[in-house]
A protein has these predicted regions:
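Short beta-strand/loop motif that positions the catalytic acidic residue
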Residues: 142-143, 149-151, 155
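The serine-hydrolase catalytic nucleophile loop
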Residues: 7-19, 33, 41, 161
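Hydrolase active-site cap/lid region
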Residues: 83-128, 186
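Conserved alpha/beta-hydrolase "acid-adjacent" motif
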Residues: 156-162
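Catalytic histidine-centered segment of alpha/beta-hydrolase-like enzymes
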Residues: 182-192
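Alpha/beta-hydrolase fold nucleophile elbow
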Residues: 63-75
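Alpha/beta-hydrolase active-site loop
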Residues: 13, 42-62
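Short beta-strand element of the alpha/beta-hydrolase
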Residues: 1-6
Length: 207
């Protein structure tokens, strides 16, 4: 399992899911996206390639089946997870929690509310790259790769209707969970949902 955080976050914030993976017998890797945490790089379009490399690395670990490497991304991490899975054969399935669309990321980038380290050139490159991508199309490109979408109805940053729209673009196997209430960060740290995610992945990637 490759775990991808959102904007303004870092890998340590998802340690609870990493521990849940380990307890369920999954190898798990969380990393700092560019422009975050201990990463020395500025955030930019190369972030997508980083995910593919991380997935291949996890698949190369002893006792890890390279055909069962999955990704879980939250918010901006959900955007990267879906696009990464749509373009990399190293990724088998996706869990996206309150995934941000390119429109949400562009709005945050232009308003300055998107927390990340990126200078003017990096921000310009990121804005141009986001303008060329559509998360709905990426969902369609997943084809038969399993997609689990989780969203809190009370999300104050990204409306849950966005995940409902993405779900309509997804092929089977797919699953959408919309939680009553909550907020932008509540679903990613819910222990029950973490267990449900892993069980759903086990069932779908074993078929």
């Amino acid at each position: 399992m490759v775990i991808i955080h959102g904007a303004g976050s870092r890998k340590e914030n998802h340690g609870d899911f990493g521990r849940a993976c380990a307890a369920a017998g999954w190898a798990a890797l969380a990393y700092d996206q560019r422009g975050h945490g201990a990463s020395e790089e500025e955030m930019g379009p190369a972030a997508l390639g980083d995910l593919g490399r991380m997935a291949r690395f996890v698949g190369s670990i002893d006792d890890v089946d390279p055909d069962r490497v999955c990704v879980r991304g939250s918010s901006m991490g959900g955007f990267v997870a879906i696009h990464g899975a749509a373009t990399s054969d190293a990724i088998r399935a996706v869990v996206a929690i309150c995934p941000a669309g390119e429109q949400h990321l562009l709005q945050g980038l232009r308003s300055g509310s998107l927390e990340m380290r990126a200078g003017p050139q990096a921000r310009a490159a990121l804005e141009a790259w986001l303008g060329e991508h559509d998360l709905r199309q990426a969902v369609e490109l997943l084809g038969a790769k399993p997609l689990l979408l989780i969203h809190a109805r009370g999300d104050e940053r990204i409306a849950s209707e966005w995940s409902e729209e993405l779900y309509r673009h997804a092929a089977e196997p797919r699953k959408l969970i919309v939680l009553p209430g909550g907020h932008h960060h509540s679903a990613q740290h819910d222990a029950e949902l973490q267990g449900l995610s892993l069980r759903w992945l086990e069932r779908t990637i074993s078929n």
